[in-house]
Design a protein with these regions (language model features):
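Membrane-embedded multi-pass helical conduit in multi-pass membrane proteins
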Residues: 18-50, 54, 369-476
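Membrane-proximal soluble regions of multi-pass membrane proteins
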Residues: 324-333, 337-349, 447-492
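C-terminal catalytic/acceptor-binding lobe
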Residues: 297-383, 387-401, 459
Length: 493
């Protein structure tokens, strides 16, 4: 594709988003009947999404309970006695994370059901962090003997690179590639996990992963994804942040049921063969996970699958030094995630390049899922919250028609039905959330239910606004810088 078409494909999604979110305003005068039906269809779509979230979260939770009850190590010993030939490389990209947070992450890895001697730790730091090597040496001294090996990489940012997780892990991958050649490890039995520095991986994750890896003959065209739940510090963060991450956590659980159209994110695993064939990560992207999935998809001519691991991965909710810095950090994190809209252009350009070798239905399924996510990110709140009120308010002629009169009533009915599935979200969150700390008073528990009353506000501040921000920046050609979300161990200055 030429530069013109690449740029056009970049701005197309933001343009469509702005057209849709402003439609209730301008279309109320130009196409009043059409905009009414558009809003009702959109509300029905939201009801479908709410129902899917509620039902799939319950189904997934039941599967998580089943998975946690299985002794996967015993199953390995019975079904695959030579399971020790599988080694798991774990990248932990870090930049200014507190020592205690990294210790927690490594402790969870050391206490896996699968023997820790099957794990190779790669602590991937940035040269920009002055104390990284000192911190890394302390961690290696404490944990080195527990694992198969403990490697440290120190990434020096180059001029043509974008600071962030992607460029860091590409550097680490090239270092590890040389390491594997020296150690003469069998690459056919290696997996690579990208683990966010704050993520505590469930103790059964790698034993379950090993079983699934050995069981599946298509292991080299496959990613594995667990359920990311933001519960490490959920009792400590401000209420608006807690609401956002509660919804994200339940969504992470529910999405396990949609592996055929889902994407990898945050903490995920693939075979080393798959990563090497793909060329690992790119060094000039911010949102690396969906981008990597599409890159691997085209590198394998569309023969790529995602398999869910029905186990939780415990992450930190966004937290700052104080209340307001926490809210700002949450906004910046969501804006960074919304910047993944750039993946739409990347996917289109790669499809044009590889279209002769790619199954169109296979590509369309993934592409529509990505387009739905990013196209509607800035739009959802406006249509759902204000959409039904605006056309009759702006167009007096529409107001006195039957269609205009019933629009707010029908829309309200559909959205009321949607709130029924909020019960599912509250229930699954309650079942998965860690026990209440002693320093959290019981009356605080009431807020865990009342907090959902703030959804219209939090949805705008942490959903619509960062989405509009990211889309507008892309539309105007203003690139986004990677801002690392701060991590805390509960001790703040």
């Amino acid at each position: 594709m030429s530069k013109f078409w690449i740029r056009f494909s970049e701005i197309l999604t933001p343009i469509l988003s702005w057209i849709l979110l402003t439609a209730p305003f301008w279309a109320s005068f130009v196409f009043p009947t059409i905009v009414v039906y558009f809003i009702l269809v959109f509300d029905a779509y939201f009801l479908y999404k709410a129902a899917s979230l509620g039902i799939n979260s319950i189904r997934s939770y039941l599967k998580i309970r089943q998975t946690t009850k299985v002794n996967w190590l015993e199953k390995l010993k019975t079904d695959y006695p030579d399971y020790n030939k599988v080694k798991h490389i774990i990248f932990i990209p870090t930049y200014k994370e507190p020592l205690s947070v990294l210790e927690r992450t490594l402790t969870f890895l050391a206490e896996q059901e699968l023997p820790a001697k099957n794990l190779i730790i790669v602590l991937a730091g940035e040269d920009r962090e002055k104390d990284f090597l000192l911190k890394a040496d302390l961690l290696k001294a404490k944990f080195n003997k527990l694992f198969f090996d403990f490697l440290i990489t120190n990434h020096v940012l180059k001029k043509d690179e974008v600071a962030g997780k992607s460029s860091n892990q590409l550097f680490a991958a090239n270092v590890v590639k040389d390491y594997l050649e020296q150690k003469k490890l069998d690459k056919a039995f290696l997996t690579l996990t990208s683990c966010d520095a704050d993520v505590s991986i469930h103790p059964k994750y790698f034993s379950n992963l090993t079983y699934l890896f050995l069981k599946n003959p298509n292991r080299y065209q496959r990613f594995w994804q667990g359920a990311l739940v933001f519960y490490n510090n959920i009792w400590r963060v401000p209420l608006p942040v807690r609401v956002v991450h509660t919804i994200y956590s339940v969504m992470g659980v529910a999405e396990l049921m949609r592996a055929s159209s889902n994407f990898i994110y945050s903490t995920y695993t693939g075979s080393w063969v798959l990563f090497e064939k793909t060329g690992f990560w790119d060094n000039d992207v911010i949102s690396e996970d969906w981008h990597l999935f599409f890159k691997a998809f085209f590198a394998n001519e569309g023969s790529l699958e995602l398999e869910s691991i029905f186990l939780p991965l415990y992450a930190d909710a966004t937290e700052g030094q104080n209340y307001w810095s926490s809210l700002l950090a949450q906004y910046q994190q969501n804006r960074r995630w919304a910047w993944g809209v750039t993946d739409i252009s990347y996917a289109l350009s790669q499809f044009v390049k590889h279209r002769k070798n790619i199954s169109i239905p296979n590509f369309v399924l993934r592409f529509i899922r990505a387009l739905e996510q990013h196209l509607l990110w800035p739009v959802n709140w406006w249509i759902i919250t204000l959409g039904a009120s605006i056309p009759p308010l702006l167009n007096s002629e529409l107001r006195y028609t039957t269609l205009g009169f019933y629009l707010p009533k029908l829309s309200g009915l559909i959205l009321t039905l949607s709130t029924f599935f909020l019960i599912c979200i509250i229930s699954i969150d309650w079942l998965l959330r860690p026990p209440r700390p002693e320093n959290v008073k019981k009356p605080f528990l009431i807020l865990t239910i009342l907090q959902y009353l703030t959804l219209p506000i939090t949805g705008f501040i942490f959903g619509a606004l960062p989405g509009m921000d990211a889309h507008t920046r892309l539309l105007l050609g203003k690139r986004l810088e990677y801002k690392v979300t701060e991590k805390f161990d509960g001790k703040k200055n």
